């Protein structure tokens, strides 16, 4: 139900010639590439504004915990909580959840900025709806609704007694003599466990840019993932205006998914708003509405409805043959990627030669992006501003963003786009931000600059946790040269009884909750089998052959993915403009989430095939 028109297979007659568009793509990429220097070191801003004990974290002291458990789960986000529920379903109650935040919720705990919302249909994104009996209020849930559902899950399964909040794990180490993991924390805890689950999440460790002069700025500044309502007024639910901004000039650096959601609310409440842009996002409208019983009852009647709906969504995006009614189809409405997937599927069915497939796909991609650029022109009144807001790159180079009010915010006289022509801001002064050689005075500066994403980023950098395996080697050292080696993206050789949840080498779709479900199912069944009465083994790890085969499968098609990434402007999808520096092993499982889930089910059905046991 988005405003983007259906995708034709060739560009409209009104489009620029294809060669002109591709040349424009290259020009825009090159100007950003020259100014993009990845930096894995923590900045002064990071130390000052992104600590866990930050503006939204109370001080907390407690006595050290010394205990042995069957399972320790690191992370109380959706992945950690769903895994805990699945463990309970297996009859396993001896587990601890270590969460660095004041509350559980992961991404949704940290990202409490105004306007925070999910752009995946709530019926498939909010986990355990069928089990809790909860029906979402909106088609796309707000952050507040998601956090309330997290609390509902914790209450229903009595997970509160398992959770240790405000606890940063500092190191974990496998003790081969005891077949136990040793876990250390910032509270001097000493925990041991048979199984260690890393559910450390994707979007929680702020990525703060190294901007000269940041320490000189005299105004308030914070990252969007550490929003300070004491400075802005208002609340995470958006129930009251940010009244403290009525007399303030605000600057936002970053126009990715977070920035796009934040800007409309700031535009309403701030006296003046500057939006500093390096690269525009591709913006698609998204219909959100209140869910009525008339809409939801036909969906939720059959047992297993939520899992089935997740599968329907992934089948549509993977363009498989699947008979669907119009009601089923609403699960993926607005997903422009669906059009491109169908183009690919059609070419496969027609046995189009690989050389021709690239050409036809590129034409379809250009057509879609022309529709998105036309949407900008139709929404933004000022022609010059509209031109600067148009994305000039292939569709999936950057995360697509679905938001109705972002583009129209620039029709307000109080909102000004500061496009940096791909260069980013130059520096900060005591009074504000210098961009394009001009100082823009601001009272408040907000960094909507994203997070340290998993792909290509050292585990310690993202989590502040050292993970030592059976030979004393850290996980980062093991993956340093060639990238990750795993089985299913979950099991890691030389790290026995370690179970990892993340996108790397796993099946991934736009709905990451589906990935969490499949991973948690596998993890809980594997642990359950190991803990059965009479089990003859206490530890597992993937065999050399099984892990090598899985890595080889992950690397398949890497050359095509690399070529695509090299055509994109810098961003976290392509290693900030250096995709050749990221080994192919960091990729997702290329055969899709259904094939990934089937491979794990086959492993379990065949007596944990591919796993060594002792």
From Swiss-Prot:
Pathway info: Secondary metabolite biosynthesis; terpenoid biosynthesis
Residue numbers binding FAD: 99, 107-110, 119, 125
Assigned keywords, A-Z: FAD, Flavoprotein, Monooxygenase, NADP, Oxidoreductase
Annotated Pfam families: Pyr_redox_3
Enzyme Commission numbers on file: 1.14.13.-
Membrane spanning stretches: none
Positions marked as site (Transition state stabilizer): 399
Disruption phenotype: Abolishes the production of penifulvin A and leads to the accumulation of gamma-lactone-2-keto[5.5.5.5]fenestran.
UniProt enzyme class: oxidoreductase
UniProt cross-references to InterPro entries, sorted A to Z: FAD-binding_Monooxygenases, FAD/NAD-bd_sf
Catalyzed reactions: gamma-lactone-2-keto[5.5.5.5]fenestrane + NADPH + O2 + H(+) = penifulvin A + NADP(+) + H2O
Leader peptide range in chain numbering: none
Cofactor(s) needed: FAD
GO molecular-function terms, A-Z: monooxygenase activity
Cofactor note text: Binds 1 FAD per subunit.
Residues reported in the UniProt entry to bind NADP(+): 255-261, 278-279, 398-399
Family note: Belongs to the FAD-binding monooxygenase family.
Function, as annotated: Baeyer-Villiger monooxygenase; part of the gene cluster that mediates the biosynthesis of penifulvin A, a potent insecticidal sesquiterpene that features a [5.5.5.6]dioxafenestrane ring. Within the pathway, peniC is responsible for the final regioselective Baeyer-Villiger oxidation of gamma-lactone-2-keto[5.5.5.5]fenestran between C1 and C2 to form the delta-lactone moiety of penifulvin A. The first step of the pathway is performed by the sesquiterpene cyclase peniA that generates the angular triquinane scaffold silphinene via cyclization of the linear farnesyl pyrophosphate (FPP).
Name of the protein this chain belongs to: Baeyer-Villiger monooxygenase peniC
Organism encoding this protein: Penicillium patulum (Penicillium griseofulvum)
Gene name of this polypeptide: peniC
